[in-house]
């Protein structure tokens, strides 16, 4: 794998929630003191950083996609379909936010680009390396024809069973310091971008499937609406894709709240019963722990809401995560209504809460594997996600035959220009 180097540079950053629970920039209510001043204190936690300036601005809201289209119409630019087709290989990033995000090999499908059965090719990027809120990758491109373009991605999201992951798209126009400078050059501002183009781009959705998929920029839902964008001929653009919880953030907050309540309920119970309760003893839970009994019923209802959300608003089917919610919901309702069932089911309660905690951890991650992005007009045929039967068979046969000729001893070696004259003995 090629060596990744740090590229220190000045960057503008708007303060966000580092856990990704809130996708919008954080807002602060500031009140000046008697001297009309506001004091801000920054405390270092880890890693060195240089600050040039801090800027306080009024709260900004992103326009909707409909408002974005209206701005394009009012700008005077032609909104005809673009004629160019640009394919950006996922592994060919300009920058990544961390050296953990790097190209990886995939030979599972003949349509993965590029593909070579005789060699190891780092032909995709992402997987579980690109899953933490705030991690980003960047690409640069330009088109040879001004107009509206769809952005398709070939991706695989086979990591979160029955759930989807989200990404935030930001676009930057390179070479123009301001919108006015761009307008002076082109006579309109249609192709100028400086961040999130519209609100829907903050929660682009990639659904679960074991196979490769091809999809345009979409927020998901029943309509699965895509969002064509305007690009100007000859202008260099930067695409910035960032991991975000998106519409999953509210669900994650609810899951964490439920888990905290259930942990408190469990501690309340074992304070009375000990870690190994007697199944035949009357602990008088209703009299001694009425709030705990009530809370278990309340959390049972909340778990039902989580399960319904996963079944209806994700991929529409049950999964291992909905199974955890359904089992825990049934158990909580049983324990909350019948105090005699608490001691008998305490071990199951502990086990289910542990599994639910794993669910919370998984929900915070957003793994995604990218093969390529393709920028093309709406009338151009959509790229295929999977190879047909004959091409797939040919790929598998070729992979099998070439496995006898691959030099596995040289895999991973790189010529850096350095030579070693001495050898060492390893024992």
Describe each PLM feature range.
Residues 414-427:
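Short, well-ordered beta-strand elements
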Residues 1-395:
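Extracytoplasmic
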Residues 71-81, 400-417:
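A short, compositionally biased domain-edge/stem linker segment
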